[in-house]
């Protein structure tokens, strides 16, 4: 067992992105396999809690009128200007119920793809003495990959739970996983491949980091 202290980071698994009735699926921006990824992430959350590993949820949340959304995003994707979801305090912005996110859980709100940018995430992780991250969530090739890269550049070793992630298409998901793996930005693990002493396995069956061993 290595000496890393892990946290599980669940990125943006919110109703607005993942649930069929969420604001993004309603405008044709649904994610392939989203609810399956949520179900797998719920397993990961349960495993982490059982091992006393901190679980941190991020939410992509905007103020009323979305003044903090960003001009570049609206310019490149004007259809998003009409999306009224992801407002704080709404069902759309809430974490998917399957994840069991409670009011006293660790939740970091963000307004950019990178969960570290302009947020309290890094001080929170340092305060918890976290030295390595498991990451899962949506969208694989956008917020998940951006956050994984940012974590790597901050010297957090990253393990991506690939079967707990989803993207617009499975191909985009796979390409993102390949990029993170090929450039050694993250180890790739799987919750559904099985566990040995609480450790997720890679798709090949070779054990990766002991991310679910007791902290």
Regions found by a protein language model. Give the residues of each.
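N-terminal nucleotide-binding beta1-loop-alpha1 segment
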Residues: 9-13
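Active-site-adjacent betaalpha module
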Residues: 1-7, 43-51, 68-69, 76-215
